[in-house]
Amino acid sequence: MPDTTSLDSIISGIETNKVLIENKIIHTLTDCRGYLKNDSLTIYIGPSNKRMKGIVGDCGGIYSWCIGNKDIILMIDPQIQGWIGLLPFSIAHQYQHAYSWTKMNLGALLAMNLMDRIVAEGKADWYAHVLYPDVKMPWDTALSDEGLQYQWSRIKAEMRSEDYYQIQGIMFGSDNYPEFTGYSVGFDLVQSALKKNAALTPEQWSNESPALILEMSEYKTQ
């Protein structure tokens, strides 16, 4: 029998917080449009389900993704404490993806190599942190400085890999890599590049190629 009791509770929690969620979305989009212009976005809200319970929990109660330059999906579990504080960050992260969707060819997920994915996620996280610097996401502290260096030494030779399952294992964690390795490395890589090039606007660096961002960073492949 499917677990409908838990799902009903999640849906009820979303309905209870409907106005709060709507207001958060409105304010966040206003913040986002102050740096990058992207109008007429549609944001879909859905309940977390049993299959997604693990990743939603690991992400603090919200798992989000972008499915085009105008569509963002938010999967929410209001039963996880602190989710509302992460909502603006999650929206801003996906907003940057939506802005970059066509320019960076984000729609071709299966054709992206590891460098594309790491830099794309790093850019989105950096943008969200520009808007909400006090918000801490799980992957912000997933790796220590030493851990970042060590994992980079392991994956830097794989930057051109287009193996989808290998990339997913690096990004989210697997038997071979700690949880959120790719996200942690991506954010630190982009952060190191943009701190050294602070004059670049969000519009400018959003449109820079992954290869150039890597070249600008303190991360070296040799």
Where are these regions (language model features)?
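N-terminal accessory alpha/beta regions
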Residues: 1-11
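Auxiliary, metal-adjacent structural segments of Zn-dependent hydrolase domains
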Residues: 10-69
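Short pre-active-site segment immediately N-terminal to the catalytic Zn-binding motif
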Residues: 75-91
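Pan-zinc metallopeptidase signature
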Residues: 156-222
